[in-house]
């Protein structure tokens, strides 16, 4: 049984350090420009107020819809945005293991990996050396490539020893022809993305400008839905007021089936659809085969 306990930094050219662990929970949506003012700027010229009282839509409403839009975007694209420390257990499959222990993390993008270990039961059997890790940040893929020399470093493990038989020899178990074992791989990493650091330049570990745009438009949809109900009242298509022979008539596109801002919402849906297509291509699609 191998019990490598290699110490030192987990970061290197194959796993760059993008964020300090102690700073992970300090990032907020405002750091990414996802603010109330950003949403209001995108409905410039449209005053979202209650016509009876003149009261503006409160900022708390905008904030809740921004949070909902972020959650919706994460589910649509199968990504995470705010940085977070994640701990996962992955099953052993012989085909994946023979492909340099391929692991597809449950969340993406991956900002940096902290630890990859092999477990059996409740114990750690082997901690993979940092220099073996191959990290593909954007799709959330990890692979392990041992040193190809006869001696793989301080642990004295060679490539032939690391990939012998159908079961991971590193576990200390004999090769038994099994193709599956549950939760043998333990992975700790930081998932999410960082705010843009330079205008006009998109880095893989930073928020894509199209993603920011889509989130704002998702939040804006909720604002326009509320505004459509406020124009003259929910479900009212037209209204007339007469005082001392002076009349005023207001006709809208609103009906019992459609709100007053339906046309704006249709346009937003088209914009969101186009942004989604491009972002889905950028972040990729998670495909699972059984």
Question: Where does each model-flagged region fall?
Answer:
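Conserved short "hinge" loops at termini or chain/domain junctions
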Residues: 1-213, 217, 226-229, 257-290
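Short conserved catalytic/interaction loops centered on acidic-Pro-aromatic/His motifs
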Residues: 226-242, 246
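Protein-protein interaction interfaces in oligomeric scaffolds
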Residues: 242-262
